[in-house]
Design a protein with these regions (language model features):
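A common structural microfeature
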Residues: 37-39, 65, 85, 103
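Acidic active-site catalytic centers that drive phospho-/nucleotidyl reactions
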Residues: 44, 67, 141
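Short active-site loop at a secondary-structure junction
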Residues: 53-73, 77
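Sec-dependent signal peptide recognition
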Residues: 3-11
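Beta-lactamase-like hydrolase cores
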Residues: 19-59, 124-130
């Protein structure tokens, strides 16, 4: 329904260039036969001239049209080439036996497109550093995005729905995990990141017996100059915005 409405609006706006004011209302009415849920108000902000007004006071649910505002703002503020980064790092050296005695840290900063394949690349990076054993925990920073994790105005019955995802500074594999042959949506994206990263560590022969811990990574640890660090970058913002709007992806 949303995509159909957007196509109709696009057709109407394109037609504005050639339609006279007197015939425009007839044009809108013809489209209203396809869907009655049309409300249009177009105003020239420079002259305050109302260009089009059709059922302007009809209350409408903006729905996915809001994505246009948020994505346009992000492009304006960050630029189309901006990329979200995720940092995975160790704070100390790996000894000659391949043993690392500390924690491994994941600092996630808003990438909605992270995948298990990129986590595998990170694990391969640490394997090349001769990492064989991690004696500490997986620490995942859970403070980059503010609370709440779930919109307080959303119904509890919506939880677990793909169109009402939890708000998190990371999404790995679209926040999906497999259980009994079925893909399910997690209600704890950061913890799922830890679970998937732990699985990849072990499947690549790296011994890990610690826990997955969600907490703030102190700034002093993020700034340690000699840490071993791997950086994962998202596709460019312009590519992410395409997914948001073209596919109407609520997760992104």
């Amino acid at each position: 329904m949303v995509r159909s409405t957007l196509r109709i609006i696009f057709f109407i706006l394109i037609s504005l260039a050639s339609a006279e004011a007197a015939t425009f209302k007839e044009l809108v009415k013809s489209q209203a036969k396809i869907t009655p849920n049309i409300s249009i108000f177009i105003k020239n902000l420079s002259t305050n001239e109302v260009i089009v007004s059709y059922r302007a006071n009809k209350r409408m649910i903006p729905a996915s049209n809001q994505k246009i505002i948020t994505t346009l703002t992000s492009l304006d503020l960050l630029g189309e080439d901006f990329k979200f980064s995720t940092y995975i790092f160790l704070l100390d050296k790996i000894n000659e036996k391949g043993i690392y005695s500390g924690n491994i840290y994941i600092d996630s900063r808003g990438d909605p497109s992270l995948s298990s394949s990129k986590l595998k690349d990170a694990v391969n990076f640490f394997k090349e550093k001769d990492l064989k054993v991690i004696q500490g925990n997986i620490i995942i920073d859970n403070t980059y995005f503010e609370s709440p994790e779930y919109n307080k105005n959303w119904k509890n019955s919506w939880k677990g729905s793909y169109w009402a995802p939890y708000i998190s500074s990371i999404a790995v594999d679209n926040n999906l995990y497999k259980s009994g042959g079925t893909f399910l949506l997690t209600d704890n994206p950061l913890y799922l990141l830890g679970v998937k990263f732990r699985k990849i560590l072990r499947s690549n022969g790296i011994i890990f017996k610690g826990n997955i811990v969600l907490k703030e990574i102190p700034l002093r640890d993020k700034l340690v100059p000699f840490k071993i660090i791997y950086e994962i970058n998202s596709p460019s913002l312009s590519n992410l915005v395409y997914i948001v709007n073209k596919e109407s992806d609520n997760l992104y």
